[in-house]
Curated annotation (Swiss-Prot):
Stated name of the protein: Hematopoietic cell signal transducer
Residues recorded with modification Phosphotyrosine: 72
Topology with respect to the bilayer: Single-pass type I membrane protein
Chain positions covered by the region annotation PIK3R1 binding site: 72-75
Topology, Cytoplasmic side: 57-79
Membrane-traversing stretches: 36-56
Quaternary structure and interacting proteins, as annotated: Homodimer; Disulfide-linked. Heterohexamer composed of four subunits of HCST/DAP10 and two subunits of KLRK1. Interacts (via transmembrane domain) with KLRK1 (via transmembrane domain); the interaction is required for KLRK1 NK cell surface and induces NK cell-mediated cytotoxicity. Interacts with PIK3R1 and GRB2. Interacts with CLEC5A. Forms an CLEC5A/TYROBP/HCST trimolecular complex depending almost solely on TYROBP. Interacts with CD300H.
Keywords: Disulfide bond, Glycoprotein, Membrane, Phosphoprotein, Signal, Transmembrane, Transmembrane helix
């Protein structure tokens, strides 16, 4: 469950968003198409990298132990 501080932040976020003016972004310009394409491509590469690392880590983690052939009395399915 989320800590109470996070819930308070979520409740106050719309209030803070309503306090900002539409033109309050000084010096902000439109993003160029190559920059936007680069950001999307970088996001896709990072997402695939994270998925790959998680897949490799879970695959290594799920390998059975070398002593998996032992018989355990109180563990059904292992004997």
């Amino acid at each position: 469950m989320a800590p109470p501080g996070h819930l308070l932040f979520l409740f106050l976020l719309p209030v803070a968003a309503s306090q900002t003016n539409e033109g309050s972004c000084s010096g902000c310009g439109p993003l160029s198409l190559p920059l936007l394409a680069g950001l999307v491509a970088a996001d896709a590469v990072m997402s695939l990298l994270i998925v790959g690392v998680v897949f490799v880590c879970m695959r290594l983690h799920s390998r059975p132990a070398q002593e998996d052939g032992r018989v355990y009395i109180n563990m059904p399915g292992r004997g």
